[in-house]
Every structure is written in structure tokens, then in C-alpha cells.
A protein has these predicted regions:
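Dinucleotide-binding Rossmann-like beta1-alpha1 core, especially the glycine-rich loop
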Residues: 46-122, 271-274
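Glycine-rich FAD pyrophosphate-binding loop
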Residues: 24-42
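Short hydrophobic core segments
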Residues: 7-9, 187-199, 368
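Active-site substrate-recognition segment that forms the wall
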Residues: 20-21, 48, 80-82, 198-327, ...
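N-terminal Rossmann-like FAD-binding beta1-loop-alpha1 element of flavoenzymes
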Residues: 4-30
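Flavin (FAD/FMN) cofactor-binding core of flavoprotein oxidoreductases
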Residues: 118-121, 141, 293-295, 299-374, ...
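Helical element adjacent to the flavin cofactor pocket in flavoenzyme catalytic cores
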Residues: 134-183, 187-190
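Short beta-strand to alpha-helix junction loop
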Residues: 60-63, 89-97, 134-153, 299-305, ...
């Protein structure tokens, strides 16, 4: 049976980028892709918040990340649809503008406040009377699935093996993981990297391994070209007053860790952050509801959720009031400290994590590049700071 240097499980942005970078380092790589349509990469906005660094690590990674995105289509030989557009963080009418703006002062490039009239110059579909203004900054953007497809294309061009199959388990011999099983056969690898985002905890729990990695259930409404809005939406719209990051901090607090290990439990009530982005082909995505529940499978009233998201964005953008669209959901991963969980799982050789990215489109690309170099012998203190062992 053929043994590869690395088996990478998961083909979202994390697995696609990691498999490509490992192959560039001369490693033999098997990428296993379950082709699950409900992935966080597929249903993301595709935004690149390169302006949002708050410390030396995040600033350096986001600068490196946006530089990678600007040249990536040429490098990979396939289009990612990278562009820069205006991000508008809208402030609802009647809200305290100063209070809404203050949390953004910490960022490397703080978004600037604009009046309702100026916001409507940037995005004519906004209802001027519905907002007290907005914070705006230039924001990177890619087509998420085309980005993954571009990585996969370049990976296969270098001889990487891309298998469409689910992974049913990890092959474990004592304290060593030696491969994975699929419905048809087992595959052997010197090292296995789990890049499965919100499904990572479930995979690890199946072998009685517990690490502090978490997920939300994110919901969006996709408006297809058949169902398309007639008018172009120029900007990416998101709320300036958003509770998701504070909620993630509460949901990952060590005091609630037992709930994650003995679920299912609702950790916090759902959060609705009204937003919308239109891709270059006119496809439109409306979002988003985040549910903080430890279950991987969750029963949701899809019609009611979709209606709430459409109504919320239509209050600011009446052009969207009549669209229908299709409701989707996915698991979105996050960690306790905002940094990803990388590297070897303690006390179990052969198994690595590459998951838990809070801002994957902004910082994952340079992290994948550095991780692949680190994994093949190049010391990197930044990768050391992201290792799973920091929580053990």
C-alpha cells in the first residue's frame, strides 16, 4: 500500500491551501475531499479584512495575506476573482455613532465614518433614512469556491492526489495515527492533517481527543442568477454593531468547556448580523444568523430563518425586499484566543491540526505557506505560537 508524506483531510480554504503548500515543499500529498456542499468556505462572503490587524502577529499576517491574494491567480494559473471593494459597516438610525465607531479604533487601518449621504454615494441601494451613517474601508474579496478550485488545480498540476471521498475514521496504532479510513479502503500517511473546520471537534472526539476548538452554525440566503436582483450592489454591507466576536469569546470560555464535551447544548441565543455581498457574476449572498450550539447537526426552521435575514437587510436596502433565494447553513470554526490551532496533537504522534481560523481569507494563506515550511524543517516562532500545545 502506498504511503504518502501527508494526508490532508478537508478541502475548504484551509485544506486546499495547505495541500498546495505542502506539495510545493516537495511532499507527497493525498487531499481527501468529501465534496460536502455545506462548507464554511462555500457559504462565506469571501471577504478579506486585511485592515483589521490588532497586534504584531495579525498585522504581519494580514499584510502578507493581501499581498498573496493580489498575485495568486497568476501563481495558481486559475482565476480567484480577487478584487478590492468598499466595505460599509452600517450604523442604524438612532444609534450612538461614537459608541459604534469606538471599537474600530484599535485596527491597523481604522474604518472612517461617513454620513448617510456619503454612504449612499458608495452604495446607492442603501436607504439613507435607515442609517445614521457607516464606517468604511477598502476590503479584499474573492470568490470562495473559485479560490479553492484554483488551489486544487495547481495542487494536481504538481502531482498531488485529490480523492473525493468521506473519511470514516483515523487509523490508530497505539499512540500513533498512521492513516485514515474511507468507505472503500484505508490510506496510509506519515502524517495526517485535519483541516475540517467546524467538524474538527467531532473527528477528534471519535478517538477520545479533546482540544479547545469550537463552531457556530452560520446561515445565509443565496440569491441565484435565476432569482437575481436587477440592480448592481457595489459594496459589501455588514453591521458596525456586531456581537458575534464577543459571543465567540463567551462560547469558548473554559468554564463552558464541559458543555462542549457533553452536548448538545445551546451556549448562547442566536445572533443576526444583517449583511450582503454581490459577486462579480451578479450572484448575491445575504447573511447571516449565527447559532451557538454544540451539536453538529441541528434542526432549524429554514423558512423562518431565511425570512428574518431577508427582512433585516431589506430595512437598509429596499431593493432586496422582494427577493426569495435559498437558505443554506454551515459550521464555522473558531478558537479561544483568535489564533488557529496548528501542528501536532499532544500525546498522539502523526496527527496534526490545521483549523480554527477566525479570519481565514485574511490570514490563512501566509500561515499555510509558513506551516508547510515549518513542517519540512524550517523553524518558525510564529507557527510555534499557534500550536495546539499552547492549551495543554
Amino acid at each position: 500500500m502506498q504511503t504518502t508524506d501527508w494526508i490532508v483531510v478537508g478541502n475548504g480554504i484551509a485544506g486546499a491551501a495547505l495541500s498546495y503548500q505542502l506539495a510545493k515543499q516537495g511532499q507527497s500529498v493525498l487531499l481527501i475531499d468529501d465534496a460536502n456542499p455545506d462548507s464554511a468556505t462555500r457559504y462565506s462572503y469571501g471577504g478579506i479584512a486585511y485592515w483589521s490587524g490588532t497586534d504584531a502577529i495579525s498585522r504581519a499576517l494580514m499584510v502578507a495575506g493581501i499581498e498573496r491574494h493580489r498575485t495568486l491567480s497568476e501563481e495558481l494559473g486559475a482565476e480567484t476573482e480577487f478584487r478590492e471593494l468598499d466595505l460599509l459597516l452600517t450604523i442604524p438610525a438612532g444609534a450612538d455613532v461614537d459608541a459604534a465607531s469606538q471599537p474600530y479604533d484599535k485596527f491597523e487601518i481604522p474604518p472612517r465614518f461617513v454620513s448617510p449621504a456619503d454612504a449612499c454615494e458608495l452604495e446607492p441601494q442603501l436607504d439613507k433614512g435607515a442609517i445614521a451613517g457607516a464606517l468604511t474601508v477598502k476590503h479584499g474579496h474573492v470568490h470562495p469556491t473559485k479560490l479553492v478550485a484554483a488551489f486544487n488545480h495547481a495542487f494536481r498540476q504538481m502531482g498531488g492526489r485529490h480523492l473525493i471521498s468521506s473519511v470514516t475514521g483515523l487509523v490508530r496504532v497505539g499512540d500513533k495515527v498512521t492513516g485514515v479510513t474511507t468507505p472503500s479502503q484505508a490510506y496510509v500517511g506519515n502524517r495526517v492533517a485535519i483541516a475540517t473546520g467546524g467538524y474538527t471537534r467531532r473527528i477528534l472526539q471519535s478517538i477520545n481527543i479533546h482540544v479547545p476548538i469550537y463552531h457556530t452554525h452560520a446561515e445565509v440566503v443565496d440569491v441565484s442568477q435565476v432569482d437575481q436582483v436587477d440592480t448592481k450592489i457595489r459594496a459589501l454591507i455588514m453591521p458596525a454593531i456586531a456581537d458575534r466576536f464577543e459571543a465567540e469569546a463567551k462560547a469558548s470560555d473554559p468554564e463552558v468547556e464541559p458543555l462542549w464535551q457533553n452536548g448538545p447544548h445551546q451556549i448562547l441565543p442566536p445572533i443576526l448580523d444583517a449583511g450582503v455581498v454581490q459577486f462579480q457574476d451578479g450572484f448575491t449572498r445575504i447573511g447571516q444568523i449565527s447559532r451557538f450550539n454544540t451539536a453538529v447537526e441541528l434542526e432549524v426552521n429554514a423558512a423562518a430563518s431565511a425570512a428574518k435575514m431577508r427582512q433585516a437587510i431589506a430595512q437598509q436596502m429596499p431593493v432586496l425586499s422582494a427577493v426569495s433565494g435559498t437558505w443554506h447553513r454551515c459550521l464555522v470554526t473558531f478558537s479561544r484566543d483568535g489564533l488557529p490551532l496548528l501542528g501536532p496533537v499532544p500525546d498522539l504522534s502523526g496527527l496534526h491540526l490545521f483549523s480554527g481560523f477566525t479570519s481565514p481569507f485574511a490570514m490563512l494563506l501566509p500561515v499555510a505557506q509558513r506551516f508547510a515550511a515549518w513542517a519540512t524543517g524550517t523553524p518558525d516562532p510564529l507557527i510555534d505560537k499557534m500550536q495546539v500545545s499552547r492549551f495543554v
